[in-house]
């Protein structure tokens, strides 16, 4: 055969020739390619010599034209093991790049296995053809392409249907086409390299893959590989024609006499494979007679297929499988099921276990010991070969296979089959160019989300009995047989494949070695040699330890069914048979009566967009739209006509003071006036002579904190101090970074004997061993399953009526009766005392979205918009209406100096002057007497509900109620008496297959078999001790499949199952019919702002509007003129402070005082010791309905509701607001002269009149409204301090403002003396509005008033941001203890005071960064002895004295003063890096560094500090005193204060322009600005990290690193999460102790944990050695029930406690399987005496007689007849009762009694 590459060489040579040469060469080329003989695989593998496992059979045609007989084919059985070197098939050494694979095959029905596998020299599979229900073409070239997930899978093809199929596969360029039976053609993409190379240096295996257990079984007639990709299209014409055509010379290529194709035979065929047929992609073109075989499969076959074809695991076994099989054009249901189960990597077994339709009765299947599970090589098969053929993201293999991968299989690290690790995902490819024949449909998308569960339908009538099911799945394989006798030693074979990694790790097994061992195993089996010579004697192994006793083996397999015996006489009446499986679903019942109206459903999803409607009619005139944005300024219009004169403006401000006029003539001497007010303080006099030495003054208040002094020089080394007490353990530091790998340590001593390793992967089947000796007789097996139900006896005679039985015990307490009529209201109780302020509750869950709130206050005006572009000049507008009153005019210009006025008359007595300035605060007054008794407080809150009262006496018997609804079908009645023997009936039909019988007697010993081939000698194992005799015998050979049984009788209806877990989401159903219109939906969200409507007509005048809210403060007014200097007051003499009097004797006790106001909260006490645990309280009655809580924050916006029905016509609305003025109408005609109009507005200002005579002084006007605040005037001269004014009355408390932003924390102020509480003034009546007076000038700001009366302590506010720590204050002297004053109202912030005394110890904060150690100060000189000072700081601890007697516990002392700082200790070890510390004091300015790069834009800085108070202005002139007005309402907010000083922005936060300016300022102002850039990025990074952490705390994700508290929390945070497994951490500490649970969101967010493997339950048994009435944990095989998380780990006790604290109720199911044993109610005795008893987690026994929260969902064991079960549910609000940890069984011990049970999960609902 010529090399395949010659075809390409020839093609390159063709370009240089003419058209004639081109045509000739093409014909030659065709002869050359087509003439190359196909590779006959069957011939190369020696099929015609019928090797082991291969036999000849009838082929595709039983009678072929022009042939003597039928086609010849070969039957391949499981014993066939055929392989050959690939070069034997391709002697030229090259595999064609484009090729066809042609085969005619009839696989065994339902099989899925590889027909051919080609491996390279490294053992990697390059080509594989897998046939079965969904054929797969595996291809991997030398570059590893395509990836396993891209292997072509032909889902629409089923070859394993038990029929002959002619299959042709064409591989050309990057597509692969499969043609089945010459009709069905499917094309898939094949993403391989441009020059894909297939290595021929390996081996080719037929019928399987290396290390694969699935083996091809079936018939094959032909298997060819040819280098022509077009040959696949002519397979049915030239290679395997129909039966009515004669076979070509090479049709049955397996015959030995046909060696090769004659070129002349092949060249005659005209290859008409048109482009049209080849270009179709994924389309399936087939004739009308071809049907999809898969559609006809029944459901049972589908299930069968699943069991046989367990590739991996099923993700949604019980939910995705459709329950019907149809022949319509739906997607093929079988294909869908298979795709799901075949492709996903989830754990098949765990899903099957949770399913209600279990395929296996055996409950003990799980991921650890089930034979169904994939083992190591199968897991590798899934991951390496198939993974997922859908476009789903694939999870890492260790997640996909879970426990299915053995412990020693590390898929992610060790390469599989010699592969390297997968590379990173490549970049996105170029856009595809769709060529003809290249378009491939993608796989169907994943199923849509589950729809909302519909309401349950009415129960249909019982359906007809179902058809008998197919044969059940095959049983689990038997235990492995006993080891054969050791074979003779073989030859030694050294493999140089083991090579170690680095020096620190033992030898690893390489992929090459594993592959080589497999290839050698194949070669060894295929080329079995003669027995080798005797091997070397191995060294004796160490003596093994005694093995543990083996577990008792399971019962043996049932023996073959014996011949049917003669029918005996009818036996006694049999026990009722086991409940049959549920029949098939009945036909659809008649529609039931309409049910009651259901609750309102959730808002549906938004509907599909409807068709575009017709254009609507023009709607009515809309209301005027909102004002539009400011347009661009238009050009100046034409000047309009002069407007009408406006109304007179308000009175202007006072003009500036005129210049003094000329002096008038002296007037008459006036009458002496009354003495004037006291003048202002005179100027400071000269200092007097020094006075005598005064008495020492009282101790002054501590001064303010001085600045930090410069560091002193280092002092001498002090003596080492005494060792301090050991500090409390600090919080754990953050985990450090991972250190570098250390050097390899020295070889340690040999470790102890390790545990027995996990079983290795399943080996290749060994050769048959020599038959062993006959074993000893086994022990008696366990009871077999009960026999079949006997034939039904004749009906007995009716028994006599029995006597009336004794009166039964009192039944259980009935359900709570309906509520009686409401009683008369009781007498009103006395008013309770006012309760204390409660502790704020935990934050509630966010409520549902509240109704739309009322309109908020008007917002602040927005910022000015950008200037618009210049508009077009407008037309001159119409003459406008008369404008409103103009604003108050600005202050007029200064007028001319007036003429000297005439002489004035003598003035009258002036009014009394205004009160003087407020004096300083007086000294603190004495403590007042107790006030009078206050009025009785409001009634207190209702008390807690009392304990439930004792049970009341039995009430009178009620009237007979109406007949109740039909009861449940009662249990089966007692067995009747045996009837007489009937006549012998006709032989019945064959019964259903019997349940497992007792093992048959041992057969005779067979003849000794031929000795098997010599095996390879195993390694010498250690000599084990003699094992105990095994119980289970060798498994029998697999029997032939039995015939399908006849139809079984209909079983009784099955019990109600316990509620199953929620299935996964089904596919979205079709859109249903439109429902009846629902109620009107809630108002939708506000729509987007509509476009402004057209201008409507002018509306009628609206009603008077409600008075608007107080407006915003106006801008600052213009500056006032400077006032004249006021008179100075006299200096008052301060009185001397009296000395403290002697302490008086104790007076007689006074009468008890009235209850004082609530005191200020005291200092936080230390943590108390936890008290003893209280007993579980009684279950209280339901409390009264609580007060409505505060509205929660708005919930998320719901889905768009469906449009509601049109509402009824509304009533006439109020008259709308006045519309905007309409456009000017046309000019009307000249009207007649009108009548005299009303008085016109005042005319314009007249000319200035002459100066009139001075009028008489007018009476004082009413006080005018407060004027606007003026701008601060220039600083006046400092006036003398006035006398102290009387304290003002306390103002009414203002309304509580909204909480402001956290300001920067100020320095702590000094501790002031407690002020006297001001008496609360009674609110005066609201006065009438006064007449507006002239604007008054600003008064000086008053001194802060004394503190107001104490308000009640409010709830604790939100925690403020942490401020910087204050500097340590100087020690103050100990003051005298004053009486406790009442808490004052919140005063203005005080000045900075000294640091207060030490508070109680706070909780340990986060560990800060270690600060820079300060320099040690010098030791000062001793000062002179002063007066006795306050107690000094605590000295160093003395030497420990003798231990005294324990004294009584004293009262808690006052906090002590801060001790002196001790000398510095020795430098400790370097600590872990702490959190960032507080900012240190600024250091000296360093040298200027190089300007750094611009940092990121920081957040906006804090608001600036308030500016300094402006200088006091000059005193204004005294105005006339007005009459005192009534107290007015609180005024509007004051005008804005002066702007604060701008703190220099940080360079890192400012723009470039500002930063350059700042740097220039830095150059000018030397040391003003610190370098803040260091550490800012770290701070912002920390803030961002904190923000993310807080987000995760608020909305946890349920992952291991971000767990939720409970599943309920997770549902509230993410209501769209599906049911499944999530991580929770109930105690919310470090997430390291979180654990994984199952969250059942369908049931409201339940948190479910499961019992462990040994606590799940026990199989039904008679338990002969156990006593009734004992706990299961006391049984020989019993134990306390324990529970695990989903990962199989035990749950921390603390976590369990927290989970219960967060739970409101919990539930758990318990299923009791019985045979003649009662579980709850006993029908025979009519009592609950034999009811099960459960032991709760709180050691409380629970049963029927003491726990009302236990009920039975189904009680089949009550009749004590036959096999039944009882399902018990514990649903309790007493969380400590579950999960149950033990169960007491009372009804067993008789010979026929048996029981078993299953324990369900416990689910907590928060």
UniProtKB/Swiss-Prot annotation:
GO BP terms in the entry: cartilage condensation; chondrocyte development; collagen fibril organization; detection of mechanical stimulus involved in sensory perception of sound; embryonic skeletal system morphogenesis; endodermal cell differentiation; extracellular matrix organization; inner ear morphogenesis
Stretch list, region Short nonhelical segment: 509-511
Leader peptide range in chain numbering: 1-35
Domain Fibrillar collagen NC1: 1577-1805
Native source species: Homo sapiens
Swiss-Prot/TrEMBL domain comment: The C-terminal propeptide, also known as COLFI domain, have crucial roles in tissue growth and repair by controlling both the intracellular assembly of procollagen molecules and the extracellular assembly of collagen fibrils. It binds a calcium ion which is essential for its function.
Chain positions covered by the region annotation Nonhelical region: 230-419
SUPFAM superfamilies: Concanavalin A-like lectins/glucanases (SSF49899)
Chain spans, region Triple-helical region: 529-1542
Allysine modified-residue sites: 612, 1452
Gene for this chain: COL11A1
Assembly description: Trimers composed of three different chains: alpha 1(XI), alpha 2(XI), and alpha 3(XI). Alpha 3(XI) is a post-translational modification of alpha 1(II). Alpha 1(V) can also be found instead of alpha 3(XI)=1(II).
Protein name per the record: Collagen alpha-1(XI) chain
Biased composition (Pro residues): 699-710, 1076-1085, 1218-1229, 1343-1362, 1430-1439, 1493-1509, 1530-1539
Homology family: Belongs to the fibrillar collagen family.
Stretches assigned to the Collagen-like domain: 442-490, 532-586, 583-641, 616-674, 643-699, 1393-1450, 1429-1487, 1483-1541
């Amino acid at each position: 055969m010529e090399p395949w590459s010659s075809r390409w060489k020839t093609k390159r040579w063709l370009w240089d020739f003419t058209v004639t040469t081109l045509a000739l060469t093409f014909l030659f080329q065709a002869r050359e390619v087509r003439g190359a003989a196909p590779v006959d695989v069957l011939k190369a593998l020696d099929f015609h010599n019928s090797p082991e496992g291969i036999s000849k059979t009838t082929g595709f045609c039983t009678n072929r034209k022009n042939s003597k007989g039928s086609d010849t084919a070969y039957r391949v059985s499981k014993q066939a093991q055929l392989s050959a070197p690939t070069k034997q098939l391709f002697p030229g050494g090259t595999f064609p790049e484009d090729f066809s694979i042609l085969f005619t095959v009839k696989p065994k029905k339902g099989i899925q296995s590889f027909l051919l596998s080609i491996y390279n020299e490294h053992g990697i599979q390059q080509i594989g053809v897998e046939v079965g229900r969904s054929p797969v073409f595996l291809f991997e070239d030398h570059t590893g392409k395509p990836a396993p997930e891209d292997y072509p899978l032909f889902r629409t093809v089923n070859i394993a249907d038990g029929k002959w199929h002619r299959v042709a596969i064409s591989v050309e360029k990057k597509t692969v086409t499969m043609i089945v039976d010459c009709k069905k053609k499917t094309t898939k993409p094949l993403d391989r390299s441009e020059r894909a190379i297939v290595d021929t240096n390996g081996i080719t295996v037929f019928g399987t893959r290396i290390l694969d257990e699935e083996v091809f079984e079936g018939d094959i007639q032909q298997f060819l590989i040819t280098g022509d990709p077009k040959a696949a299209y002519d397979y049915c014409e030239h290679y395997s024609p129909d039966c009515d055509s004669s076979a070509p010379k090479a049709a049955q290529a397996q015959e030995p006499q046909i060696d090769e194709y004659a070129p002349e035979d092949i060249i005659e065929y005209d290859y008409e494979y048109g482009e049209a047929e080849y270009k179709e992609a994924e389309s399936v073109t087939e004739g009308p007679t071809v049907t999809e075989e898969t559609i006809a499969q029944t459901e049972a076959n589908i299930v069968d297929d699943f069991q046989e074809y367990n590739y991996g695991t099923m993700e949604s076994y019980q939910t995705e499988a459709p329950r019907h099989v149809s022949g319509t054009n739906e997607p093929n249901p079988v294909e869908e099921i298979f795709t799901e189960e075949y492709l996903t990597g989830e754990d098949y077994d765990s899903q099957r276990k949770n399913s209600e339709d279990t395929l296996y009765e055996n409950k003990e299947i799980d991921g650890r010991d089930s034979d169904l599970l994939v083992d190591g090589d199968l897991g590798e098969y899934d991951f390496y070969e198939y993974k997922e053929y859908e476009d789903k993201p694939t999870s890492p293999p260790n997640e996909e296979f879970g426990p299915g991968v053995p412990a020693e299989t590390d898929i992610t690290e060790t390469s599989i089959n010699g592969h390297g690790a997968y590379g990173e995902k490549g970049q996105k490819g170029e856009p595809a160019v769709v060529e003809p024949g290249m378009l491939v449909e993608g796989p169907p998308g994943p199923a849509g989300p589950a729809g909302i569960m519909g309401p349950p339908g009415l129960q249909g009538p019982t359906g007809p009995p179902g058809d008998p099911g197919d044969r059940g799945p095959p049983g689990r394989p038997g235990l492995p047989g006993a080891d054969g006798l050791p074979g003779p030693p073989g030859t030694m074979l050294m493999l140089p494949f083991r090579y170690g990694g680095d020096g620190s790790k033992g030898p690893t097994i390489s992929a090459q070695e594993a592959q080589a061992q497999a290839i050698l195993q194949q070669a060894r089996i295929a080329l079995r040699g003669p027995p080798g010579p005797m091997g070397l004697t191995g060294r004796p192994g160490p003596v093994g330890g005694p093995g543990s006793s083996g577990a008792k083996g399971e019962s043996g397999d049932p023996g073959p069914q014996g011949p049917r015996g003669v029918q005996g006489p009818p036996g006694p009446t049999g026990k009722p048979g086991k409940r049959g499986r549920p029949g098939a679903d009945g036909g659809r019942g008649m529609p039931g009566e309409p049910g009651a109206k259901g609750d309102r459903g959730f808002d549906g999803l938004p509907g599909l967009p409807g068709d575009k409607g017709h254009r609507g009619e023009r709607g009515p005139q809309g209301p005027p739209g909102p004002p539009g944005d400011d347009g661009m300024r238009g050009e100046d219009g034409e000047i309009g006509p002069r407007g009408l004169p406006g109304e007179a403006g308000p009175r202007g401000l006072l003009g500036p003071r005129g210049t003094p006029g000329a002096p008038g003539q002296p007037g008459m001497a006036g009458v002496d006036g009354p003495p004037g007010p006291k003048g202002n303080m005179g100027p400071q006099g000269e200092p007097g002579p020094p006075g005598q030495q005064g008495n020492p003054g009282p101790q002054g208040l501590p001064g303010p904190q001085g600045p930090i002094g410069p560091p002193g020089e280092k002092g001498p080394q002090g003596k080492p101090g005494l060792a301090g007490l050991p500090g409390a353990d600090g919080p754990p530091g953050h985990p450090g970074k991972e250190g570098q790998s250390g050097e390899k340590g020295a070889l340690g001593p040999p470790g102890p004997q390790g545990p027995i390793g996990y079983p290795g992967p399943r080996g290749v089947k060994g050769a048959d061993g020599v038959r062993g000796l006959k074993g000893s007789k086994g022990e008696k097996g366990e009871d077999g399953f009960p026999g079949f139900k006997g034939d039904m006896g004749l009906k007995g005679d009716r028994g006599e009526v029995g006597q009336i039985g004794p009166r039964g015990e009192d039944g259980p307490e009935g359900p709570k009766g309906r509520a009686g009529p409401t009683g008369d209201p009781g007498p009103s109780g006395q008013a309770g005392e006012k309760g204390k302020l409660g502790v704020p509750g935990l934050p509630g869950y966010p409520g549902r979205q509240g109704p739309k709130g009322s309109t908020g206050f008007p917002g602040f005006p927005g910022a000015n918009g950008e200037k618009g572009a210049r508009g077009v000049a407008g037309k001159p507008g119409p003459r406008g209406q008369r404008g409103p009153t103009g604003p108050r005019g600005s202050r007029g210009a200064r007028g001319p100096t007036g003429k000297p006025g005439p002489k004035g008359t003598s003035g009258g007595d002036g009014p009394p002057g205004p009160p003087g300035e407020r004096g300083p605060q007086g000294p603190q007054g004495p403590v007042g007497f107790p006030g009078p008794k206050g009025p009785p407080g409001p009634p207190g809150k209702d008390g807690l509900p009392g304990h439930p009262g004792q049970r009341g006496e039995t009430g009178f018997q009620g009237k007979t109620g109406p007949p109740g609804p039909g009861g449940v079908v009662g249990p089966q009645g007692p067995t009747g008496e045996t009837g007489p023997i009937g006549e012998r009936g006709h032989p019945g039909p064959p019964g259903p297959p019997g349940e497992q019988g007792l093992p048959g007697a041992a057969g005779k010993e067979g003849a000794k078999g031929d000795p098997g081939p010599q095996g390879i000698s195993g390694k010498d194992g250690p000599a084990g001790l003699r094992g105990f005799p095994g119980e289970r015998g060798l498994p029998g050979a697999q029997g032939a499949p039995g015939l399908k049984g006849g139809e079984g009788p209909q079983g009784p209806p099955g019990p109600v199952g316990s509620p199953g877990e929620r299935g996964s989401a089904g596919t979205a159903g079709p859109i249903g019919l439109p429902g009846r219109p629902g109620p009107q939906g809630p108002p939708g969200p506000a729509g987007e702002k509509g476009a402004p409507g057209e201008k409507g007509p002018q509306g009628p005048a609206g009603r008077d509007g409600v008075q608007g809210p107080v407006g915003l403060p106006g801008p600052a007014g213009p500056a006032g003129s400077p006032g004249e200097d006021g008179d100075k007051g006299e200096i008052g003499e301060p009185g001397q402070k009296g000395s403290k009097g002697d302490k008086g004797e104790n007076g007689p006790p006074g009468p008890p005082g009235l209850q004082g106001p609530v005191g200020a909260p005291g200092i936080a006490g230390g943590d108390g010791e936890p008290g003893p645990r209280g007993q579980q309280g009684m279950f209280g009655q339901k409390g009264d309905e609580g007060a409505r809580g505060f509205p929660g924050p708005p919930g998320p916006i719901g889905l768009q509701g469906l449009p509601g029905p049109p509402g009824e016509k509304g009533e006439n609305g109020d008259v709308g607001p006045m519309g905007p003025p309409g456009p000017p109408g046309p000019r009307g005609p000249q009207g007649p002269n009108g009548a005299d109009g009303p008085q016109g507005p005042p005319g314009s200002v007249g000319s200035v009149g002459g100066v009139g005579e001075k009028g008489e002084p007018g009476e004082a006007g009413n006080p005018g409204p407060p004027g606007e605040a003026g701008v601060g005037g220039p600083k006046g001269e400092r006036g003398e301090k006035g006398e102290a004014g009387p304290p003002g009355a306390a103002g009414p408390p203002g309304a509580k403002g909204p909480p402001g932003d956290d300001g920067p924390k100020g320095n702590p102020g000094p501790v002031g003396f407690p002020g006297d509480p001001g008496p609360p003034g009674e609110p005066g009546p609201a006065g009438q509005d006064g007449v507006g007076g002239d604007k008054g000038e600003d008064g000086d700001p008053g001194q802060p008033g004394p503190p107001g009366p104490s308000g009640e302590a409010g709830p604790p506010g939100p925690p403020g941001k942490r401020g910087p720590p204050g500097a340590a204050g100087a020690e103050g002297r100990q003051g005298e203890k004053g009486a406790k004053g009442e808490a004052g109202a919140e005063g203005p912030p005080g000045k900075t005071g000294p640091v207060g005394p030490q508070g109680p110890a706070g909780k340990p904060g986060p560990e800060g960064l270690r600060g820079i150690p300060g320099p040690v100060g010098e030791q000062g000189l001793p000062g002179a002895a002063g007066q006795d000072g306050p107690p000094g700081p605590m000295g160093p601890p003395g030497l420990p004295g003798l231990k005294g007697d324990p004294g009584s516990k004293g009262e808690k002392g006052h906090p002590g003063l801060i001790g002196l700082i001790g000398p510095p200790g020795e430098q400790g070890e370097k600590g872990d890096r702490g959190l960032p510390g507080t900012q240190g004091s600024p250091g000296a300015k360093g040298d200027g560094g190089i300007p750094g790069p611009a940092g990121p834009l920081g957040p906006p800085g804090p608001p600036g500090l308030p500016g300094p108070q402006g200088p006091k202005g000059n005193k204004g002139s005294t105005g006339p005193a007005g009459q005192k007005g009534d107290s007015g309402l609180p005024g509007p907010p004051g005008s804005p204060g002066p702007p604060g000083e701008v703190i220099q922005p940080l360079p890192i936060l400012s723009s470039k322009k500002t930063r350059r300016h700042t740097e220039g300022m830095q150059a000018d102002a030397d040391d003003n600005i610190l370098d803040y850039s260091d550490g800012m990025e770290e701070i912002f990074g920390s803030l961002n990290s904190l923000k993310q952490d807080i987000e995760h705390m608020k909305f946890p994700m349920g992952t291991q690193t971000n767990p939720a508290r409970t599943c309920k929390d997770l549902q509230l945070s993410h209501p769209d999460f599906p049911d499944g497994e999530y991580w929770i951490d109930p105690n919310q500490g470090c997430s390291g102790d979180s654990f994984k649970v199952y969250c059942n969101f369908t049931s409201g967010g339940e948190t479910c944990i499961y019992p462990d493997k040994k606590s799940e339950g026990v199989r039904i048994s008679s338990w002969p050695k156990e006593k009734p009435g004992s706990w299961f944990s006391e049984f020989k095989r019993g134990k306390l029930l324990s529970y695990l998380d989903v990962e199989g780990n035990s749950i921390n006790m603390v976590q369990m406690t927290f989970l219960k604290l967060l739970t409101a109720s919990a539930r758990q199911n318990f299923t009791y399987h019985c045979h003649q044993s009662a579980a709850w109610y006993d029908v025979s005795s009519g009592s609950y005496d034999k009811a099960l008893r459960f032991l709760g987690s709180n050691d409380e026994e629970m049963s029927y007689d003491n726990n009302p929260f236990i009920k039975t969902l189904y009680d089949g064991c009550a009749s004590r007849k036959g096999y039944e079960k009882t399902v018990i549910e514990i649903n309790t609000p007493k969380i400590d009762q579950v999960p149950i940890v033990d169960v007491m069984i009372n009804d067993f011990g008789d010979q026929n009694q048996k029981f078993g049970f299953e324990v369900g999960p416990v689910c907590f609902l928060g």
